Structure formats: C-alpha cells, structure tokens
C-alpha cells in the first residue's frame, strides 16, 4: 500500500535570501514576518464592537422603506417619551446645526439625514440615541414618518427618458438624470479609427451587482470632549486619514483635534473606505448628549446602504482591419445610474462615461447628496480600438 508520504514529493529546501537579514536591505525586500496572527488565532482580536467606553450610549438609524418620496412630516414624540431614549435627531435638527450635508471623498456632498425627500430605499431619515442598542432599535418603531410617494426610476436604461422623474432635483437647473460626463483621450483620433475600420464588432455585456459583505459590518464610536474640544473616533474604516479630513470639514474642527482609531477590521474589501452618514450621526449624537455614542449597523443595513460594485450593462465596440489587426485607439462610455465616483482605469486612448441615477439604488457618490455607490466599470485594454457604452442595470 502506497502512503501519502510516499506519493508526495518532499518539499525542496530553498536557499535563504541573503538580503533577508541585511541591515541596509530595501523596504519590502525579503521576507516580511507577520506579527498580528497569534492574537487572531487565539480569539484575542479587538474589533469595534469590543470597544466599550464609560457612559457610552447607543444609536440606531431609521431608514426609508421607499425608493423615492417626499418627506411630509416626522413625528418623534412617542420615541422621545421612551424611558431609555436620550435623543432623536432628524434632518431638520441637523440643518439647525449646519450638519445636514457632509462632503464625500469624491468632492461632492451627501445628505446625512433626509430633509425634503428620500432618493433611494434605505436612505437615513432619523437617528435615535438610547441607553442600549435594543432600546434604540425599539424606539425606531415609535417614529411616525409621513411620505408622499413619488415615481421611482428602477431601470437605468430608461433613466434618461424624458418621462422619467428627476432624482437630483436638489441641483439648480437639473432637468434630467444625467449626472456627469468624464472623458479623456483624443475624440477625433478615435472616431477616425472607427470610421476607417474594415470591421466593427459589437457586444452587450451584463455584469451583475456584487457586494463585499465583510464579516464585520460598519460602525463607529464618537467621543466628543466638550472641555478640551477634542473628538476621538473609533471607526471601522480603511481610510482613517481621509476620514479625519472629512470630519474636520463637517464639524468645523482643526484636524489636530480629531483622533481616528481604526481597530482590528473584520474585512473591508473597499466597503469601509467611504464615509457613511451613520459615522457622522455618532458625532452629532455625542455633541448633543455629551457622552460617547456607538452605532453598529446590522447585516441588512450593510447590504442595503453601503458600497457595492459592478451591476453594469455595457455595450462595447471594437474596430479592426480585415486581416484581424486592432488599431491602437479605443473608447469606452459608461453611463451609470448609481453615481460611481472612481475614474476609469484606462491607460491610453479615450474613455467616456455618463452617469445616471436610479432611485432604489444605495449609492456612495460624487453626484448624489444622499447616496453612496460602488466601483466603476473597468476595461483592461492597453492598446486596442474599442469603445464601451456602459449602463448599470438595476440596483
């Protein structure tokens, strides 16, 4: 009988890298020893939900069940009467504090809480601060919101039709759902290649939506010290320095008074780069109550209102000669309904994108003040004559 050991080749002993122990070796050259593993395999990791501060309160977010609707009224009387509720914050409250809108990492703004209307299902409407997590969640059911339902845009391919409702009507002069164009390269040279091509091959591609779904959801603890004016944040962020800059803009504090602590992160995959309204709301909650406030989203919130990716309907064209050669010019157009913030990944040629919104999406964006979305369409052609028209399908 042949054993596994007899069948398996013995591992070859590799010669050690002479630069591994050299004092003057370049950074990153040679083997890098991992130091974080022992505490994780022993269950000693310290994640955000393991952080408990003295006197800490807990927050929960009321989200819109509708994709597109006017907010007629918000009655928080019953929620405030709950014995364990310390505060209920609405968009109107934030307007009084000049905190209704927050800048994004894409140099636009997003609504921290909806004020005039909701623009996607799951948009933040109110924030409850209570003594414990369960009381905060229970109090959400005591908030009475009256909505005036509006038509929603659910098909990105129809978002630019003249009969579609305008989602971004907060922007002055906006009469359609065309959010922005992004273009690079030589338009005339690209068009000339296609005009002279012997063959133009077209294809439509549907790329379904994907979500990073990290094991740990997003959350934050904000601790505003009113005596020193210092703000300490414990956050599930992959970009603590960028977050500090945004918080400085939101709260009007100098950056040196803001400390962002990123503890052990239970997965991110890009999902924890953006700055979500829940983060800002913990800061507001701490300012209002004078105590640390923790917010930790549940799984359904994470899937509903944080960054996702893909979800494209793309139309592509490749120009070629009759003998199969592809000239070194290409083009891509990417209309997206979810306001994707990231630039195209092209290295040469002409890249063109148009962005259009669909109401039920959960975007993370440069273009919608109440939205956040995932990543952009990507084309890896280095030197080819292609052009892509891409529309995110549905959300």
What does each of the following model-derived ranges do?
Residues 12-27, 85, 160, 181-194, ...:
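Charged, low-complexity, helix/coiled-coil-prone segments
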Residues 30, 36-39, 103-104, 175-220, ...:
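Glycine-rich loop/linker segments at domain edges
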